[in-house]
Amino acid sequence: MISIILVMIGGGLGAIARSAITDYFNHKFTSKLPIATLIVNLVGSFLIGLTIGLSISISWFPAFFVTGFLGGLTTFSTLAKELTLMMTPKFNINLFLNYSLLQFIIGFIACYIGYHI
């Protein structure tokens, strides 16, 4: 039961952090790519790799930080929505593919680097 509470608290905090980061980047930068989602997913991927690589032995930490906070911070559903919204009558296949590749390949690389630090 404590794990569920830790995931809920961490997830809520991660979602709040994502919302704040998204608001900040949407107001500061204009881009064809959704930069805020890219940033939170890459940072989250790196931190997941780092946390797993460090093998932190605090029993509550993975539930709170990895599953909760980083799960709330990163967002696959927003990525799916953004990719779907790119499929308009003015669909740009290069933008779509570049954004997809940035998210998945660079996300994996960020996780890998975090794991091996």
UniProtKB/Swiss-Prot annotation:
Q: Please give the catalytic activity noted in the UniProt record.
A: fluoride(in) = fluoride(out)
Q: Which domain of life is it from?
A: Bacteria
What GO CC annotations are associated with the protein?
plasma membrane
Which InterPro entries does the UniProt record give? FluC (IPR003691)
| Alphabetized UniProt keyword annotations | Cell membrane, Ion channel, Ion transport, Membrane, Metal-binding, Sodium, Transmembrane, Transmembrane helix, Transport
The GO biological-process annotations, alphabetized, read as: cellular detoxification of fluoride
Give the main localization category. Answer: membrane
The residues that hold Na(+) are 71, 74
Mark the transmembrane ranges: 1-21, 46-66, 95-115
> Where does the protein end up?
Cell membrane
Membrane-topology annotation of the record: Multi-pass membrane protein
- How does its activity get regulated? Na(+) is not transported, but it plays an essential structural role and its presence is essential for fluoride channel function.
Q: Which GO terms describe its molecular function?
A: fluoride channel activity; metal ion binding
Question: Which HAMAP family does the annotation name?
Answer: FluC (MF_00454)
Protein function: Fluoride-specific ion channel. Important for reducing fluoride concentration in the cell, thus reducing its toxicity.
The record's comment on protein family reads: Belongs to the fluoride channel Fluc/FEX (TC 1.A.43) family.
Q: What is this protein called?
A: Fluoride-specific ion channel FluC 2
Q: Which organism is it from?
A: Staphylococcus aureus (strain MRSA252)
**Lineage per the UniProt record:** Bacteria, Bacillati, Bacillota, Bacilli, Bacillales
